[in-house]
C-alpha cells in the first residue's frame, strides 16, 4: 500500500482485507496468551525464526501486529515493535544499543523522564550520557567518544518545543558510524517523518498523539532498516551470533528489521514490557483519526500562540512559529504544515502567579499527560521536571513562572476564554 496517502494508510495498513478468521472489518482483539503450533517442526521453525508468526503473547499478538505495521508504514520504516509504554520503548532502544562502559550523546532539552533515564538510571548500569546543546553542531560532534553508541534527539523538545537540525545531526552521527535515534512523540508522522531526514530509529510514546484521548498507555519503536549494524563492529548483540538465542545473528536472520527483532527476541522476552492486545486495539482507534486530530490541534495552537504573544501578562512565549524564536527557521524547514501544540510560556511573576493561573482554569485539565484531544496544563518545575535541580532546570529553560500547555481540539473561543479567566484571576479580578 506504499502508494497510498497518509490518510489512507492510517486506516488500512496491516489489515488490507477483512480478518481471515472471522471476516471482521474491524481489527479484532486477540485476547490470548499463546498460540497452537501445527506440529513439532512448526514450533521449532517459529522459535528458530525460520517461520514468521506468533510464538507467545509476551512477544507477539495479532492485534499488536496490525498496530506495529501501521505505525511503521506511517513513519516510513521497515518494521516496528510496540511496548507497554513510551518509557519502555525508549529504554529498550538505549539498552539495545549500549551496554556497560558505553556512552550516549543526547539533546539537553528532552522529556524529563528520558533525561532521568540517561542521567541517573542507566549510569547505575554503566552507561553514561553527555547532554549537548543540539543547536551547536560542533558541541554535538565534539561530545562523540570512541565508546559512543548513539545520538538521541526529539523532533520537538519537551516541554519547550525546541527543534534540532535533524539533517545536520544525522550527517554527524553517520560520519562516526552511529545511529541517530529520534523521539517523534510530539512531531507525529503526520507532520514530520524523521527517517526521511536521516534518523535510523524512531520512538514514540503512543500514549500521546497516536492514542490521542488520554485512555491508553503504549510505546512503539520503528526501525528504518537503513543502518548497517555490521559495518562498525560496535553492535555485536545485533550483528554477532547471540548466545542467548542459539547463536543467531539478528542482522543475518532479520535483515533490515534486525534492530526491532533483537529487542523483541531478547529484551522483550527477558523483561516483558509487553503491550496488551486491548491497548494495541485502542491505539489503532487513535491512529485512524491521527491526521484529522492533528490538523485541529495545529489550527487551535496557532491562535493560542498569537493570543499569548500579545497578552500583557505574558513575559515570553516559547513557540517556534514566532519569528523571534531562535528555532523559527528550523520550524519552517521541518514543520511546513505547523506543529508544536505542546509548548510553554512564562507568565509575569513567579511560582505563585503560575499556580494561581493554573488553578483557575476550567477547560484545561491539570494533569501530567499531553497530546490529548482535551486541553491540558501543568507547572513543569514542580511536577514533570521536579527531579531536576535549579541548574538543570535553567539549562532546559524551565523556570518557576513557566507553564506548559497542551492545546486540545475544543472550540478555540472556549480555549481563549478559559485562558483569559486564568489571567484575570492572577490580577484579582
What is each PLM-predicted segment?
Residues 1-51, 428:
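N-terminal glycine-rich, Lys/His-bearing helix-loop that initiates the first secondary-structure elements
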Residues 39-88, 113-120:
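Conserved N-terminal alpha-helix of the aminotransferase class I/II PLP-enzyme fold
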Residues 76, 147, 313-316, 363, ...:
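Glycine-centered tight turns that cap/initiate beta-strands
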Residues 222, 344-346, 406-408:
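Short hydrophobic/aromatic beta-strand micro-patches
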Residues 2, 10, 14-18, 80-310:
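Conserved PLP-enzyme active-site core in the AAT-like
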Residues 119, 128, 146, 293, ...:
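PLP-dependent enzyme catalytic core of the Aspartate aminotransferase-like
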Residues 271-274, 278-280, 285, 289, ...:
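Conserved small-domain helix->loop->beta segment predominantly found in fold-type I
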Residues 156, 185-187, 322, 348, ...:
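Active-site beta-loop-alpha junctions enriched in small/polar residues
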Amino acid at each position: 500500500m506504499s502508494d497510498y496517502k497518509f490518510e489512507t494508510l492510517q486506516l488500512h495498513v496491516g489489515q488490507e482485507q477483512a480478518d481471515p478468521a472471522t471476516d471482521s472489518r474491524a481489527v479484532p482483539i486477540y485476547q490470548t496468551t499463546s498460540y497452537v503450533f501445527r506440529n513439532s517442526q512448526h514450533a521449532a521453525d517459529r522459535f528458530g525464526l525460520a517461520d514468521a508468526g506468533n510464538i507467545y503473547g509476551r512477544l507477539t499478538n495479532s492485534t499488536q501486529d496490525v498496530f506495529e505495521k501501521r505505525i511503521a508504514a506511517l513513519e516510513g520504516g521497515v518494521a516496528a515493535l510496540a511496548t507497554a509504554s513510551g518509557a519502555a520503548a525508549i529504554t529498550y532502544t538505549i539498552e539495545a544499543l549500549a551496554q556497560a562502559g558505553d556512552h550516549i550523546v543526547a539533546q539537553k532539552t528532552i522529556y524529563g523522564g528520558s533525561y532521568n533515564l540517561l542521567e541517573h538510571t542507566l549510569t547505575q548500569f554503566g552507561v553514561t550520557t553527555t547532554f549537548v546543546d543540539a543547536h551547536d553542531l560542533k558541541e554535538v560532534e565534539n561530545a562523540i567518544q570512541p565508546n559512543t553508541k548513539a545520538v538521541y534527539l526529539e523532533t520537538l523538545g519537551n516541554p519547550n518545543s525546541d527543534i534540532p537540525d535533524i539533517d545536520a545531526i544525522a550527517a554527524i552521527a553517520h560520519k562516526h558510524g552511529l545511529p541517530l535515534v529520534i523521539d517523534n512523540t510530539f512531531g507525529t508522522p503526520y507532520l514530520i517523518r524523521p527517517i526521511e531526514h536521516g534518523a535510523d530509529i524512531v520512538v514514540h510514546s503512543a500514549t500521546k498523539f497516536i492514542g490521542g484521548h488520554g485512555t491508553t498507555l503504549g510505546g512503539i519503536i520503528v526501525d528504518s532498516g537503513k543502518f548497517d549494524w555490521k559495518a562498525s563492529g560496535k553492535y555485536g548483540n545485533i550483528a554477532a551470533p547471540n548466545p542467548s538465542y542459539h547463536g543467531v545473528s539478528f542482522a543475518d536472520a532479520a535483515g533490515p528489521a534486525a534492530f526491532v527483532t533483537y529487542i523483541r527476541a531478547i529484551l522483550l522476552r527477558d523483561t516483558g514490557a509487553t503491550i496488551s492486545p486491548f491497548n494495541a486495539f485502542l491505539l489503532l482507534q487513535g491512529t485512524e483519526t491521527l491526521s484529522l486530530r492533528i490538523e485541529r490541534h495545529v489550527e487551535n495552537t496557532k491562535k493560542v500562540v498569537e493570543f499569548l504573544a500579545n497578552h500583557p501578562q505574558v513575559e515570553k512565549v516559547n513557540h517556534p512559529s514566532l519569528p523571534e524564536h531562535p528555532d523559527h527557521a528550523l520550524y519552517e524547514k521541518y514543520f511546513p504544515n505547523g506543529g508544536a501544540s505542546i509548548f510553554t510560556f512564562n507568565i509575569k511573576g513567579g511560582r505563585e502567579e503560575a499556580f494561581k493561573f493554573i488553578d483557575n482554569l476550567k477547560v484545561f485539565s491539570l494533569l501530567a499527560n499531553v497530546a490529548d484531544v482535551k486541553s491540558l496544563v501543568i507547572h513543569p518545575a514542580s511536577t514533570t521536571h521536579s527531579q531536576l535541580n535549579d541548574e538543570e532546570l535553567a539549562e532546559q529553560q524551565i523556570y518557576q513562572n513557566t507553564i506548559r500547555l497542551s492545546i486540545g481540539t475544543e472550540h478555540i473561543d472556549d480555549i481563549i476564554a478559559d485562558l483569559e479567566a486564568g489571567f484575570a484571576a492572577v490580577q484579582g479580578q
